[in-house]
Amino acid sequence: MPTTTRMRDVCLQKRQCLLAFVLLGSLHTACSKISAEEHHAAQRPITVRDTIETTEFADRWYFLGGTPQYPVAIFSPDRKRFLIRLKQGSVERNVVEYRLLLYNSDQAFASPQGEVLMRMSSTSNREAIQQVRWLNNDTITFLGENPRELPQVYEINIDSKQLTRLTDHSTAVVSYDISRDGKQLIFEAAPRKRRVSGTEEALRDGIVIDSQILNELLDDGGERDDPIIDRELFVQDKNKEEKRIHSSDFLTEYLPLSLSPDGRFAVLSVYVSAIPDAWANYEDEVLRPYIVQKRKPGTLSNVVQYMLVDVGQGTMRPLLDAPIRWGDEEIAWPSAGDSVIVTGTFLPLDTEEKEDGARKHGFTVEVEIPYSKVHKITGDRVSISRWNAQKQEITLASKHATGGTTARTYAKRDGRWMEIPFSAKESTDARIEISLEEDKNAPPQIFVTDRINGRRSLLLDLNPQLRQFAIGIVETIRWKATDGHEVEGGIYFPPGYERGKRYPLVIQTHGYEPQRFWLNGPWNSAFAAQPLAAQGIMVLQVGDSVVEGEDRRYVNTPAEGPRRMSAFEGAIDELDRRGLIDRDRVGLIGFSRTAFHVAFALTHSHYKFRAAVLADGFDGGYMGQLLWRLPDGEGVNGGQPVGPGLKSWFEKSPAFQIDKVSAPVRLEYYGPLHFLAGWEWFSLSSILNKPIHFVWLPRGTHLLVKPCERMTSQQGSVDWFRRWLLDTEENRDDH
């Protein structure tokens, strides 16, 4: 399994929201919805290509399925102007095009079109325009690239449109921050290409294998542009003189990097290489297996920690002696550089904090620099919404709010942080508010609202062309899994749904969020919900247990596979009971972690599945465990794959049960050497003469970005299920 497995799943922060299950009921929200009349008048079914070429809000964490890293509108310090970043795929050119739109705040209602300040296109897996920051009221900085260019940090003057490149690094710059005066930069960059097996020394003397990862030994020498955990850290002064900050830990652009306003310090989070033995006393049920995992010294772990960089000294050390809860890393500076606020960190074990659960969950804290004195703010799971420097108040938004007030404000009084009454009107300095609004049936639109008089207007309809397509209605449903727990998900009805007709079903995995408009599903690898529905296939997007956090207790245990399998089985029973599906024509898509869930169901369930897709994921297999030795394999299979534990592997691992699989399986793996993760399933299926189709995208990243690779994957899923689920004359001849 590629070493970015944990990083790939970090964005799975699910929210539960019960909505009535209405077949084709009336749908009313503040957003403009696709009505039944528009469905009937649609010109044609939507295709995978249509979904690739939609316009999207271009935020990395929004793309990952989580809370956006940046607000929809990035306001200038004086609030007089704001920027919106958008992206759109082009299948014909195989690029993703980015636009940076500039608006004047006082003209947002009168002239909502905006000015295109910058256009850039990417043929890589990176964003062409990202990490946009206002340096002052007239200047912004950003990370940008065009085809056949390395990404670098740029500065552009809003009025003169003069573009200046601030970095000239020899490799791709992947993350950065800049001081308030623009004189100090810190950035992460890809390392120079290092080959292990192809060097003259290796060919002459051989290689001693000890702590290398498999990917290093078998690397084909090709350039990589997917997010990997090998980045190097540099600081650069106003004279463009670079200095590297060395670290024995592992850096990636998927973790935050923040420079203090005065440029003296920086805070970032890293994957640590040396985990203190004492950290085994932390009790987080998901994180702990990676803390106690046996690893060779100096190798990558799946444990993250905040680090403090002294820019002047060129040194790095831990900010706190504690790990971070996955996916909760955010940083804010309440002063020029004397202290920093971070979210999601556990408290050091020697802290005086005696609160129940202090070892079980993360906290938001203020840390004084350089002494690392900790001031606790809250133990809730939150994201940083706003820092009010004038009042010294911070507003934090709950990550799992199910209703009511979702934000709380804290102020420091007499050296302690205390919650104070939250006022929505005082939570921002802006007269106008820019918001992205969407839900399961409402395509994203951007609205402008006057916070004083309540006036509200549509600023930008991202995809008015969607009204031309027949798009299936999505409804929320709950059901009982066969083991008794209750699950929530979303049903995609085929356009023109006929009551009483039983449809084939494809079960998509990896979560359901009713507040998001998903044409394909959570991500763009393998999933293709609306294009499948357009072919007359009902799609169920499976979410989590309705009891918040309950599923976490089963992760990396022998109960994980059976629990997820029972959710699939219960869904089939419920939809069959409602007369919606033909239970003899059911397919499954597993991606990333849920490839294991689907593989387990294919090999252990008594329910019969007609077809399946396993895409770029952990499958709980024996070969993968020998290659990458992750604790996940030992966790879900009940022990080590040798000695006494081998018996449990024979019973639980899908790899030893492939002879029981009756469904044709399509395998997809992305990136250099990642095909090895699917080789066991492919080889054993081939030996058993079972229908198997294996696709490898050599330069694909885990969450596919390039339009042609998305076509191969997502259209491949549509074609696969059309072939095996639809009862057509062509398919009957093919079978």
What are these regions (language model features)?
Residues 31, 35-68, 103-130, 156-174, ...:
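Multi-bladed beta-propeller domains
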Residues 70-73, 81, 86, 266-270, ...:
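Non-catalytic accessory segments flanking enzyme active sites
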Residues 96-108, 190-242, 271-309, 350-365, ...:
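Predominantly five- to eight-bladed beta-propeller fold
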Residues 461-578, 582-584, 591:
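Cap/lid segment of the alpha/beta-hydrolase catalytic domain
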Residues 689-735:
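C-terminal catalytic histidine-bearing segment of alpha/beta-hydrolase fold enzymes
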